[in-house]
Amino acid sequence: MKYILRALGLAFGALIYTIGLDVFLVPNHVIDGGVVGIALMAAQLTGISFSVFIIILNIPFFIFGYKKIGAFFTVSSLFSILCLSGWSNFIHYEPVTSDPFLSTIYGGIIIGLGVGLIIRWGGSLDGTEVLAIIADRRTPFSVGETIMFFNLFILGSSGFVFSWDSAMYSLVAYFIAYKMIDVVTNGLDEMKGMLIVTGKHDQ
């Protein structure tokens, strides 16, 4: 039963992420970072489907993740990536807003929520998140901070493929997303700690 719940949680997180990406960001030329961003740029340059690139480009990262984190994480992450690839083939709605500023804010919040949920369920949606999770265990940097570090390089290079306006909006979206990832991955633990401290104080 717990495996079914985990699979549903991972699939739901991937769905949330896909909505943020395909409904808010991409239609307004604001892109994702990490391997997803690389896949979006590759799809733009070659005309090959994004869903193909997102699987192929993630394989080396998850081989590394298998060695460093384990089979359970790797399987969960591959399942999440397959869900993202599948959802992206079905979710192609008209953008909720044509305002790039609004799409940046809400898209960043939604994709951050989706990534955070997947991490809490033991998986990953992007190869750079594999490195971020390992860095979180071995360095003082949080998952969100490490992801943002990679995105500064990847999203900066997107200006050559799309436009510099798109690159700048994308950087803003990911500043919002990485804060949202931290809220989801660490916020519940911090809230539990506050409740424990408050309970002891009342006693």
PLM regions: where:
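Core subunits and conserved enzymes of cellular information-processing
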Residues: M1-H201
